[in-house]
């Protein structure tokens, strides 16, 4: 290698050695953009040196024999050195922040003889920013100092002999820059330096693909803490996620940070690595939100790549509302087994579902009616004057009633099953058809209704025969109701003439009257409404005072005779039953067919009607089935399912209701028994008696609609919320039940099956009496239970005289109410626990009664005992019970009285299966007998070592033992009470009721 230099030979040899070992072969970092690299230039650098004899450029070979260029200076013998070396003009490109990397060696001044005063070990780095090359002159005052550079390690003469490398690397930053380029300058002030390499670069974040977004090359910011936000561009066949655009940040070190948002593959494409590939044939992706392509659903296909949906096969369709992942479907086949039933001008159609529903669950039915001339073979649509029950189209059930047909006319009915794709099909309609001929028509509408006479409590009406009787009119039906009630409840009167007098009306009240005619073909339509206001009390009194006294006496006598005849007649026919007999009631309660005196509302047994349907229509409102929406099944009754749903009457908001349905295949007797409950309930109107909304008897299924009670039966509700109510809340529930029973007793109605299971609770904890319609017959079996068609009802709630002599009165209901009180205060425990029915009857006859439930106030238990008096005449009336409970509610302190203060001691009821506690020798044996031996140590630790001490324990004592389970507390306390009773009975201190 040839060297040309003005430096001393020992300096040059050192430099050559350094050059041979200066190149490290370091790879360029990917995030750096090189502007200048002296090592990469093999020709002369030709930088400017001032003065010319200062810095000197030399060349050499590295270990790979590649030429490299370097600059050296070693003016250490003279002081005040000022040697400048300037690079050529460097274009900065897009950089805002420049990095300068220097690699150099520096001689230790102490290793040079005679230079201690003039030798330095540092040099200075400068830059000058300019938009263009300014030539070869160096104006020192234009340059800005970057830093003073010192060596971390310097070498000596000894290092040269040992061939040790001591190469220094320093990096400095410049910026922010505002011009197009710049110069670098190196100032030597008297050091011995070899500038091995100079590298100038800036950093940027290289282009990458992240979350399917392409982020381009991005130059870093001008500050060390800068983060440059970059918005990505989605790769091919991808799109930005909604409201989540892809973004990343380029740091000052050239690294991508903080990814935000992303791109997702479009419909028909799925992600594979950093690209989106199309779905293959037979696959699809309907939305960019889906991750992967899916196989086409049943009866669909895709014959090209990148499909966003699959096309349906021939004869198969997809409804507009069907999502793409749903299989293609087809219209259903025709309904099966179409049958009909003609009733004069009304036709009932029933059918079975189609054999093929087309693969859908939204099958409904629509009816097409055609009136036909069979002689000419032509049919025309029936027109809009035909009525359909419940409706003509959109039928969910498989039956319909078509009304208002012409008499003696020919009709064809087509029943078509449709689903969500029927309207898309171009195939021929599939339907079941039937042709019929109607019979005689019902009469037309009654007209000319007029009021003839209006009094205080009666109205006389007259009317004209229908214009088209269509047969012999056998009777007229007058429907009337108070206008304020808006037909919520109505009454009917029937007559054979074209006039009638409606009695027992309220004075000063507006009534609405409508009349319809009846023939062998059925009822015609009601006449238009006629509003009539009865006279006020004062007006009637004034009128009556003007009458002749003799006439008044005669009228009173005649009225008295009529009343007597009706009472005798009612007594005779009163032995007929509706569901269950009232014939065994005593006194005035035996006469359940009452003449209705003004101001008194009395229960009327529906069975007194020759036609039970008349009782239903008199006491229950007929509802339109289309106003009822059944939502779900909540139970099963004796006659069918019990459902919850909504009732929407015209002009009113919809309300939640419970719907009892009559099962398919019912007998006429079952139908009458089913509707008998509605006939009974329709007579009641009290906030603590379940309210009847109405009935549906003119369609299928037959329904009874009552108000919906959210919390269900009282016994199950109490068991579910064991211990969660205050005594006041429980007494409030009992007061509501008593108020409902008082109302029923005042009407002369005997419930006969009063129990917590037959009390319903609404969302406001209001209790209401229910269950009025089951048919009950007393059997002479040893278990003494009621037998119904649906099962047996236990006698635990029944009064002794009702079991033994079948005497059912309001007093027997009071006995049952006492049992309900016990159920409520014990949170739904079973009365008499596991005792057999025969044991219960025997214990009651011997005078034993149920003990007070845990934490039951003495006053409440005393009221229970009063209800359980053997002599029914000594039991309180429901009116008295309501008064007693009202006093307790007004004086809550009375409910805190300890049980021990009962005025009349009793012997708690003893189960024959209960262990004889006198046979136990220890507390441990007793606990083992009642399966509570786990608490033996608790009793021993508390000092309860004898049964006598245990018998004196209270509920607080039991809780103090650490027994936290409420069920275990109740079981132990009940056993203690029984133990206490046995001990008292043993010593002759027990007193029976």
Swiss-Prot record:
Domain Fibronectin type-III: 331-441, 442-537
Domain of life: Eukaryota
Lineage, broadest ranks: Eukaryota, Metazoa, Chordata, Craniata, Vertebrata
InterPro entries, sorted: Eph_TM, EphA7_rcpt_lig-bd, Ephrin_rcpt_lig-bd_dom, Ephrin_rcpt_TKs, FN3_dom, FN3_sf, Galactose-bd-like_sf, Ig-like_fold
Ranges spanned by the short sequence motif PDZ-binding, renumbered to the chain: 991-993
Cytoplasmic topological domain: 572-993
Protein name per its UniProtKB record: Ephrin type-A receptor 7
Residues annotated as glycosylated: 343, 410
Gene Ontology CC terms, in alphabetical order: dendrite; plasma membrane
Catalytic activity of the protein: L-tyrosyl-[protein] + ATP = O-phospho-L-tyrosyl-[protein] + ADP + H(+)
Residue ranges constituting the Protein kinase domain according to the UniProt record: 628-889
Signal peptide from the UniProt entry: 1-27
Single biological process term from Gene Ontology: regulation of protein autophosphorylation
Keyword tags: Apoptosis, ATP-binding, Cell membrane, Developmental protein, Glycoprotein, Kinase, Membrane, Neurogenesis, Nucleotide-binding, Phosphoprotein, Receptor, Repeat, Signal, Transferase, Transmembrane, Transmembrane helix, Tyrosine-protein kinase
PTM section of the record: Phosphorylated.
Gene: EPHA7
Domain Eph LBD residue range list: 32-210
Native species: Gallus gallus (Chicken)
Quaternary state and interactors: Heterotetramer upon binding of the ligand. The heterotetramer is composed of an ephrin dimer and a receptor dimer. Oligomerization is probably required to induce biological responses.
Stored Gene3D superfamilies: ephrin a2 ectodomain, Galactose-binding domain-like, Immunoglobulins, Phosphorylase Kinase, domain 1, Transcription Factor, Ets-1, Transferase(Phosphotransferase) domain 1, Tumor Necrosis Factor Receptor, subunit A, domain 2
């Amino acid at each position: 290698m040839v060297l040309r230099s003005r430096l001393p030979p020992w300096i040059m040899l050192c430099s050559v050695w350094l050059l041979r070992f200066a190149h490290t072969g370091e790879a360029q970092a990917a995030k750096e953009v090189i502007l200048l690299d002296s090592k990469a230039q093999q020709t002369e650098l030709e930088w400017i040196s001032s003065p010319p004899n200062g810095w000197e450029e030399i060349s050499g070979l590295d270990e790979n024999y590649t030429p490299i260029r370097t600059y050296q200076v070693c003016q250490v013998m003279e002081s005040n050195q000022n040697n400048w070396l300037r690079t050529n003009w460097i274009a900065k490109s897009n950089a805002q922040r420049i990095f300068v990397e220097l690699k150099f060696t520096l001689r230790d001044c102490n290793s040079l003889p005679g230079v201690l005063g003039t030798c330095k070990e540092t040099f200075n780095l400068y830059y000058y920013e300019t938009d263009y090359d300014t030539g070869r002159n160096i104006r020192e005052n234009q340059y800005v100092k970057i830093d003073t550079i010192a060596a971390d390690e310097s070498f000596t003469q000894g290092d040269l002999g040992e061939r040790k490398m001591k190469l220094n690397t320093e990096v400095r930053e410049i910026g922010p820059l505002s011009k197009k380029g710049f110069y670098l300058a190196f100032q030597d002030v008297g050091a011995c330096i070899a500038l091995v390499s100079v590298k100038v670069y800036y950093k940027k974040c290289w282009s990458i693909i992240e979350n399917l977004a392409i982020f381009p090359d991005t130059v870093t910011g001008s500050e060390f803490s800068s983060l440059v936000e970059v918005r990505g561009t989605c790769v091919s066949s991808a799109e930005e996620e909604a409201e989540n655009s892809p973004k990343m940040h380029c740091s000052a070190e050239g690294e991508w940070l903080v990814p935000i948002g992303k791109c997702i593959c479009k419909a028909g494409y799925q992600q594979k690595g950093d690209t989106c590939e199309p779905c293959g044939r037979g696959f699809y992706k309907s939305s960019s939100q889906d991750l992967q392509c899916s196989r086409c659903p049943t009866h669909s296909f895709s014959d090209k790549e990148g499909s966003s949906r699959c096309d349906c096969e021939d004869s198969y369709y997809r409804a507009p509302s069907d999502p793409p992942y749903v299989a293609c479907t087809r219209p259903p086949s025709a309904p099966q087994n179409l049958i009909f039933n003609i009733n004069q001008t009304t036709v009932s159609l029933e059918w079975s579902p189609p054999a093929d529903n087309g693969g859908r669950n939204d099958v409904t039915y629509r009816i097409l009616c055609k009136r036909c001339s069979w002689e000419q073979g032509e049919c025309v649509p029936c027109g809009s004057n035909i009525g359909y029950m419940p409706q003509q189209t959109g039928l969910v059930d498989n039956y319909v009633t078509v009304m208002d047909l012409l008499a003696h006319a020919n009709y064809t009915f087509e029943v078509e099953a449709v689903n969500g794709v029927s309207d898309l099909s171009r195939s021929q309609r599939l339907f079941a058809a039937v042709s019929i001929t109607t019979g005689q028509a019902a009469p037309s509408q009654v007209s000319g209704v007029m009021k003839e006479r209006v009094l205080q409590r009666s109205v006389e009406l007259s009317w004209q025969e229908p214009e088209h009787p269509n047969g012999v009119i056998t009777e007229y039906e007058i429907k009337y109701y108070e206008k304020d009630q808006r037909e919520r409840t109505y009454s009917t009167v029937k007559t054979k003439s074209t006039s009638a007098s409606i009695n027992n009306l309220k004075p000063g009240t507006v009534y609405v009257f409508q009349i319809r005619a009846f023939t062998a073909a059925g009822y015609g339509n009601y006449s238009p409404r006629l509003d009539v206001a009865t006279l006020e009390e004062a007006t009637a009194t004034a009128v009556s005072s003007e009458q002749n006294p003799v006439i008044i006496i005669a009228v009173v006598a005649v009225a008295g005779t009529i009343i007597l005849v009706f009472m005798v007649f009612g007594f005779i026919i009163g032995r007929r039953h509706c569901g269950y007999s009232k014939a065994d009631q005593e006194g005035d309660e035996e006469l359940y067919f009452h003449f209705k005196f003004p101001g008194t509302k009395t229960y009327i047994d529906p069975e007194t009607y020759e036609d039970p349907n008349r009782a239903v229509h008199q006491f229950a409102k007929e509802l339109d089935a289309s106003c009822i929406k059944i939502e779900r099944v909540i139970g099963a009754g004796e006659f069918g399912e019990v459902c919850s749903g909504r009732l929407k009457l015209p002009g009113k908001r919809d309300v939640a209701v419970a719907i009892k349905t009559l099962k398919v295949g019912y007998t006429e007797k079952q139908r009458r028994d089913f509707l008998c409950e509605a006939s009974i309930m329709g007579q009641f109107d009290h906030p603590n008696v379940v309210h009847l909304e109405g009935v549906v008897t003119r369609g299928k299924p037959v329904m009874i609609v009552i108000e919906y009670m959210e919390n269900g039966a009282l016994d199950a509700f109490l068991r579910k919320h064991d211990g969660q109510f205050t005594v006041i809340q429980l007494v409030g529930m009992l007061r509501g039940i008593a108020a409902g029973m008082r109302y029923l007793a005042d009407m002369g109605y005997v419930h006969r099956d009063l129990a917590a299971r037959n009390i319903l609770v609404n969302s406001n904890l209001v209790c209401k009496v229910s269950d009025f319609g089951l048919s009950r017959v007393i059997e002479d079996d040893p278990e003494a239970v009621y037998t119904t068609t649906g099962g047996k009802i236990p006698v635990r709630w029944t009064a002794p005289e009702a079991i033994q002599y079948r005497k059912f009165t309001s007093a027997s209901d009071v006995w049952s109410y006492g049992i309900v009180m016990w159920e409520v205060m014990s949170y739904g425990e079973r009365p008499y626990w596991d005792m057999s029915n025969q044991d219960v009857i025997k214990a009651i006859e011997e005078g034993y009664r149920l003990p007070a439930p845990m934490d039951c106030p003495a006053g409440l238990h005393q009221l229970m005992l009063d209800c359980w008096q053997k002599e029914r005449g000594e039991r309180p009336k429901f009116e008295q019970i309501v008064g007693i409970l009202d006093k307790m509610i007004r004086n809550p302190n009375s409910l805190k009285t300890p049980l021990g203060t009962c005025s009349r001691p009793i012997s708690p009821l003893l189960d024959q299966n209960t262990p004889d506690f006198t046979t136990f020798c220890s507390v441990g044996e007793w606990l083992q007998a009642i399966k509570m031996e786990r608490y033996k140590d608790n009793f021993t630790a508390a000092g309860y070592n004898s049964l006598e001490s245990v018998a004196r324990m209270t509920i607080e004592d039991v809780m103090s033992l650490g027994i936290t389970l409420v069920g275990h507390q109740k079981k132990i306390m009940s056993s203690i009470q029984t133990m206490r009773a046995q001990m008292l009975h043993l010593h002759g201190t027990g007193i029976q009721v």
